[in-house]
């Protein structure tokens, strides 16, 4: 069903987020800094409401604005996951903003605007909508990275992200212009009809477009910004960076590859396979020497994007199902891990080295138990959620005949398990360090839910797997 103006229900989540951003700016402008907590609460409510509206949308494909915006089961699944990541990262930031004297109403507004960009990006049906959504998301993220103006690290993180982000946006735009030049259309469905053979110009366009998207998912070789920005940005901001924007970028990566370029699969499959192998290898080996837990999680996220891309490299419906399942489980594991990093405070000051977790099992046994479950899950140890996610992407690769890619993925998982297990060893077997400060209630709730989800997901995986399968079918 295609039309110039889509039914109101199809764009209601985006309209709600846009309206919320305007209202929140007005509240902040009228009430000043004292409105920060109110604006934060309303922003969380807006993100949750947008997620509920997405879930209430009918399970049909709607193409609005002459195909520029697609609302289908795939977009709905990824929007729910991304909005969940955005809402939870805002919940995690409430206590930090007050403790760090960073209670600025602009923070929540920027997260809402970034979430609007994320929703537009996930629903993009042509290259122009893709670029507009990407820039709305990116411009908000550049400011959020440097939100703590009193911190040199935060300012440096924002500047690095801005400079490299601008470069990647330029590459993406150049790739999009090449694809348009060689196909005569920007619409994904139109590109699919015209791009039936891998001409040189088209392949160059795909390379540049994918390079820009690789930057957004922090895949090798466009990962350089990730460790520095993750370490330098405030922890709640890092939690947001590591979840919602990556879900959006991975969604558009999958949509462009599968929907716009189905007849040149072999060309983009080689690119995705190389990026996947390089990301898994770097994520596994570079994290081994890390002492800062945020840098460790940064390299870990690079590796996990490599694992997710294994499913896309397969180029099949099963592969895309694996990608969707992987991203959903990755978001929960990552939010839980960064909750623990946020809770690492002594005498009101944040500590970030792995050694600071020494003996945590004796000083904070429940926090240690939850973090151990998350680390085992990130390592892909059965029967935890992380294992289920890896199983599905590797199975898709094997079914598609990519045996080498699956073997490299398993080896990278084994190597990567070392640094996750080292964290568990330090928590349970080293002499206790000084105890951390008490954990705020909202962090306890996030940690409990993420820990329980990763531990007991294997008992009832069917609903999420079925939802991911239905979403993947919409693209084929």
UniProtKB/Swiss-Prot annotation:
E.C. number: 7.1.1.-
Membrane topology per record: Multi-pass membrane protein
Main location: membrane
Keyword ATP-binding attached: no
Catalytic activity: a quinone + NADH + 5 H(+)(in) = a quinol + NAD(+) + 4 H(+)(out)
UniProt-recorded Gene Ontology molecular function terms: NADH dehydrogenase (ubiquinone) activity; NADH:ubiquinone reductase (non-electrogenic) activity; quinone binding
Pfam families reported in the protein's UniProt record: Proton_antipo_M
GO cellular component: plasma membrane
Biological process per Gene Ontology, one example term: ATP synthesis coupled electron transport
Enzyme class at the top of the EC tree: translocase
Keywords, alphabetical: Cell inner membrane, Cell membrane, Membrane, NAD, Quinone, Translocase, Transmembrane, Transmembrane helix, Transport, Ubiquinone
Residues that span the membrane, as ranges: 10-30, 42-62, 77-97, 108-128, 129-149, 162-182, 202-222, 234-254, 268-288, 296-316, 323-343, 368-388, 392-412, 445-465
Subcellular localization: Cell inner membrane
Matches recorded under InterPro entries: NADH-Q_OxRdtase_suN/2, ND/Mrp_TM
Annotated function: NDH-1 shuttles electrons from NADH, via FMN and iron-sulfur (Fe-S) centers, to quinones in the respiratory chain. The immediate electron acceptor for the enzyme in this species is believed to be ubiquinone. Couples the redox reaction to proton translocation (for every two electrons transferred, four hydrogen ions are translocated across the cytoplasmic membrane), and thus conserves the redox energy in a proton gradient.
Subunit structure comment from the entry: NDH-1 is composed of 14 different subunits. Subunits NuoA, H, J, K, L, M, N constitute the membrane sector of the complex.
Family: Belongs to the complex I subunit 2 family.
Classification via PANTHER family: NADH DEHYDROGENASE
Protein name (database record): NADH-quinone oxidoreductase subunit N
Gene: nuoN
């Amino acid at each position: 069903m295609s039309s110039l103006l889509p039914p109101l229900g199809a764009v209601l989540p985006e309209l709600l987020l846009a309206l919320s951003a305007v209202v929140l700016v007005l509240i902040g402008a009228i009430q000043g800094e004292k409105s920060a907590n109110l604006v934060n609460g309303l922003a969380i409510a807006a993100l949750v409401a947008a997620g509920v509206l997405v879930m209430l949308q009918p399970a049909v494909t709607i193409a609005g604005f002459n195909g520029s915006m697609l609302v289908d089961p795939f977009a709905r699944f990824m929007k729910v996951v991304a909005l969940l990541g955005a809402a939870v990262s805002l919940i995690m930031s409430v206590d930090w903003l007050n403790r760090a004297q960073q209670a600025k109403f602009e923070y929540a507004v920027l997260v809402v605007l970034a979430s609007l960009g994320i929703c537009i990006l996930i629903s993009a049906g042509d290259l122009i909508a893709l670029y507009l959504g990407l820039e709305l998301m990116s411009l908000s993220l550049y400011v959020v990275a440097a939100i703590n103006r009193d911190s040199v690290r935060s300012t440096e993180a924002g500047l690095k992200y801005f400079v490299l982000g601008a470069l990647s946006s330029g590459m993406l735009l150049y790739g999009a212009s090449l694809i348009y030049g060689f196909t005569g259309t920007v619409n994904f469905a139109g590109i699919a009809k015209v791009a039936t053979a891998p001409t040189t110009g088209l392949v160059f366009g795909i390379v540049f477009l994918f390079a820009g998207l690789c930057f957004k998912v922090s895949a090798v070789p466009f990962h350089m910004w990730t460790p520095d920005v993750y370490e330098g940005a405030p922890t709640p901001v890092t939690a947001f960076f590591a979840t919602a924007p990556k879900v959006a970028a991975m969604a558009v990566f999958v949509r462009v590859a599968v929907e716009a370029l189905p007849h040149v699969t072999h060309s983009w499959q080689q690119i995705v396979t190389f990026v996947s192998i390089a990301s898994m290898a770097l994520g596994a080996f570079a994290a081994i020497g890390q002492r800062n837990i945020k840098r460790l999680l940064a390299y870990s996220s690079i590796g996990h994007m490599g694992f997710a891309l294994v499913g896309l490299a397969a180029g099949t419906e099963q592969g895309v199902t694996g990608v969707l399942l992987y991203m959903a489980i990755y978001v929960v594991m990552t939010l839980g891990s960064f909750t623990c990093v946020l809770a690492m405070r002594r005498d009101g000051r944040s500590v970030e080295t792995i050694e600071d977790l020494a003996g945590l099992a004796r000083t904070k046994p429940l926090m240690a138990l939850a973090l151990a479950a998350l680390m085992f899950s990130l390592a892909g140890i059965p029967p935890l959620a992380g294992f289920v996610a890896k199983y599905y992407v590797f199975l898709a690769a094997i079914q598609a005949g990519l045996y080498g890619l699956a073997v490299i993925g398993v080896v990278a998982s084994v190597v990567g398990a070392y640094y996750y297990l080292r964290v568990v060893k330090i928590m349970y077997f080293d002499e206790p360090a000084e105890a951390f400060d008490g954990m705020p209630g909202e962090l306890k709730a996030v940690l409990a839910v993420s820990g329980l989800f990763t531990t007991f997901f294997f008992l009832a995986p069917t609903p999420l797997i079925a939802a991911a399968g239905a979403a993947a079918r919409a693209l084929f």
